Amino acid sequence: MEISPADSLSISGAAASEVVSEPSVSSSSSSSSPNQASPNPFSNMDPAVSTATGSRYVDDDEDEEDVCRICRNPGDADNPLRYPCACSGSIKFVHQDCLLQWLNHSNARQCEVCKHPFSFSPVYADNAPSRLPFQEFVVGIAMKACHVLQFFLRLSFVLSVWLLTIPFITFWIWRLAFVRTFGEAQRLFLSHISTTVILTDCLHGFLLSASIVFIFLGATSLRDYFRHLRELGGQEERDDDVDRNGARAARRPAGQANRNLAGEGNGEDAGDQGAAVGQIARRNPENVLARLDIQAARLEAQVEQMFDGLDDADGAEDVPFDELVGMQGPVFHLVENAFTVLASNMIFLGVVIFVPFTLGRIILYHVSWLFAAARGPAVAASLHLTDTGLSLENITLKSALTAVSNLTSEGQGNGLLGQLTEMMKVNGSELNGANNTLSVATDLLKGSTVGASKLSDITTLAVGYMFIVFLVFLYLGIIALIRYAKGEPLTVGRFYGIASIVEAVPSLLRQFLAAMRHLMTMIKVAFLLVIELGVFPLMCGWWLDVCTVRMFGKTMSHRVQFLSISPLASSLVHWVVGIMYMLQISIFVSLLRGVLRPGVLYFLRDPADPNYNPFRDLIDDPVHKHARRVLLSVAVYGSLIVMLVFLPVKLAIRMAPSIFPLDISVSDPFTEIPADMLLFQICIPFIIEHFRLRTTIKSLLRCWFTGVGWALGLTDFLLPRPEDNIGQDNGNGEPGRQNRAQVLQVGGPDRAMAALPVADDPNRSRLRAGNVNTGEEYEDDDEQSDSDRYNFVVRIILLLLVAWVTLLLFNSALIVVPVSLGRALFSAIPILPITHGIKCNDLYAFVIGTYAFWTTISGARYAIEHVKSKRTSVLLNQIWKWCGIVFKSSVLLAIWVFIIPVLIGLLFELLVIVPMRVPVDESPVFLLYQDWALGLIFLKIWTRLVMLDHMLPIVDDSWRAKFERVREDGFSRLQGLWVLREIVFPIVMKLLTALCVPYVLARGVFPMLGYPLVVNSAVYRFAWIGCLSVSLFCFCAKRCHVWFRNLHNSIRDDRYLIGRRLHNFGEAALANQNQNQSSEDAGDGVLIGREGDVDNGLRLRRAIQQEA
């Protein structure tokens, strides 16, 4: 028998362990018998034999056989090893069966190490045809149709069970639980036989079933929570017992400890003493309580183990969701699960609703019967006497009233008798009312049992629950009395359930209070969010509308009328305007923080502060603090709107009254659709991307603060200094420059007053640091500090005043200048032939004016910088270069923005709008600007769909690669010829083909057939729809051909496929695998290849640019 190296190592290790375990024996035996076998099996061999044997083992180790990376077994003829990926070493080879099992388990299709996809090819039977016979194909289609039909029938059955049957029965169980008689149930059922009511009952039943499920989940969670509390409590008690026992043992005298040891040494005495102690322990009430607690704990542990065992069994079974709902597996399982759910719902509703309601009905019935039986005779007698007295009084009053009426009929109605008549009439009416009331009360008392049965369902249910609670306490009291009669003491802790309840009451109270606190916190946070994000922006929007209403030529009556007609739209518009203004203020404050010295705006909250958490402030701060903050925000924002919006608008109206009121209406067809899209999708993103507004505004703010701060002597206070930062970092800054603008870091409102510049006076610092002898120097110092503080406040006020005047002029100019310039440029657009004299819109005028003004300023600044640096030749080269870029980009942009959208809009109008709206005997009128607007929308949607990562049937991946290349090139490196050849020209040709081919067929070919003019007009009208139908038919035929071929391959695989063959790394796949691929897959491969070529071109171009 050969011994492998591992076996030899194990043997030698075992022998070594034996030697170590018995050192004396092994040493003696080795010394006495030297010829005894040593642990090494080669130790007693001849050296030559030993050398040969060792070399043979080394050769076997080197020529180790290849094994599978999964099962670690070698390959054989039936199951050879393969190397399907680029891995090497011990994980190179694998069995095909092992790999298939692992792939089915991990749902992977590639190697986890080298990420190489595994390649398989189908293996068919020997008699498998390349094309199925017609009969087999029809049989396969019939089997596939049967499977699909079976799936849909199973799906409809499952949905009807879980969404219709179970909810309907559950809801009717709920209804029948409140029914008092069989007749009432019959009337209730007959009144709910309609489709609408049945569907409504199904919906209510579904909600009820979901509520029951959530209640079960909540009960389970509470059970686990209380179990966890008991475990923690038991652990704490055990720790306390251990601590007490340790302390008692530490305090125990040494003699008692010795006696205990002696008692342990004497077995008989210890046994007698243990018996006596056991009798005493059994008589101790605390030990009896502990024994009952142990028994209760054992019982609860058994119950919990039973439920946990069921949970473990459920977890071990791991039933899939499809099988659980009944989509897979036998139908009997679906019926069983449905009946289980129905039974659980029925039991829950029976225990929670039916039993308490029935008990409440029984109790109320007997209580009303006892009440009627006890008070019936007395009440009847009193009612009889009262009825008799009222009848006599009524007769008397009627007689007196008749007599008085006869007396007053002779013309004395205005005297005393007339007044007496009126009084008697009133008394008679009151008497009749009292008689009626008494009769009603009599009827109620007589039918008290019926009235008791007509109480509300909630009252009856509450009475039933109170009776159940009474029965529970009565049972516990009887059990306590019985045990007390047997001589057991009455302790609350005797009953494990009561002990648990008593122990859990403080915890439940704390949890309830915590839940209520969390609930109130949530209500407070929700209320504050509604105020700060809903009401406050709405108020800002309305205040902005009030301050700018004259700019648009409107009055507040128009706004109120719009609010009354459409309150939701009006509120939404004003809220959006208010929230945009608040965002603008926040952005401006963030720009100020980036320019000013840190600490200047300490009184404003910084959203970028890592320690600032607005939600934490909402939770922690009290309500009165939030109310004060909201009122302060209202005052601040209201004042800012007046100073920065209302006054600039009034100044702009005074400066240029001819341009007001502004017209931003969207009723014009030109601006009805594309206005918001051009403004928010094209213009504003282009401005943000290319004009760098944030950098420009920060530079302007820095220049303004530098100039105004120098004029007011506040430069060191307002702006940060780089040398101060460097000095602080290095620790060796100039002390004079550091002390020149010291800012005392104090908190609260005093920080602004304390941030005063300190003069370069070393004596002042010595006076503050040292001990002074006279009080006059203190007074001079205080007077100087007061003077500096006063001057600082005055300069800050002047700074704010100058800032407000600057913003006032800037906002007025921002309204007047772009609108005037934009109107002048926009007036040239109606001259174009496609516009048909559209009127000017001030939204477009403002955007065009802003573009023109910004372009002029940027070009002038760029030219001035090059002229100052004496680089006129470079400037001319840049001008020439940018003129070429602008011309090239303008041509491409004009084709993309104007020509292509017009073609798309015309095609859409000829396909959809003209056949639907224009009669056959009329000629359509095309509005090109409307077609351009529609085409621009469709072009935008198509480009967004192309740039999405998801695969769509109407989107080609090659277009995504082309658009990404254009995005990578940018505006300055755009390759015009490539864009024209690869993007613009294919789109234009396809659109022209779609427009011209139907026109040629309808106007040139079809009239040659000799049909009447009406028929030719109808053909022309529906020519584009007909061509579209033919194109869709061809596309559907191609897709159906691919689908039938895939269906044929699937049927052939089901019938003749016997397995799959795993290919080795680098081995070519079988030819029939490529033949079985669909044309769509081939097209996808071509597209992927093109995209890869484009990506390679992008990488090569970037590398060349980096080298250059």
Curated annotation (Swiss-Prot):
The keyword Transmembrane helix applies. SUPFAM superfamilies: RING/U-box. GO terms for molecular function: ubiquitin-protein transferase activity; zinc ion binding. Residues 286-308 form a coiled coil. It catalyses: S-ubiquitinyl-[E2 ubiquitin-conjugating enzyme]-L-cysteine + [acceptor protein]-L-lysine = [E2 ubiquitin-conjugating enzyme]-L-cysteine + N(6)-ubiquitinyl-[acceptor protein]-L-lysine. Its main location: membrane. Zn(2+) 1 binds at residues 68, 71, 95, 98. Expressed in cotyledons, leaves, roots, stems, inflorescences and siliques. Expression higher at the top than at the base of the stem. The chain crosses the membrane at residues 157-177, 197-217, 339-359, 362-382, 462-482, 489-509, 525-545, 572-592, 630-650, 669-689, 796-816, 844-864, 894-914, 923-943, 982-1002, 1017-1036. Zn(2+) 2 binds at residues 85, 87, 111, 114. InterPro entries: MARCHF6-like_C (IPR056521), Znf_RING (IPR001841), Znf_RING-CH (IPR011016), Znf_RING/FYVE/PHD (IPR013083). A zinc finger (RING-CH-type) spans 60-121. Residues 1-60, 237-273, 762-784 are annotated as: Disordered. Its EC number is 2.3.2.27. The RING-CH-type zinc finger domain is required for E3 ligase activity. This is Probable E3 ubiquitin ligase SUD1. The gene is SUD1.
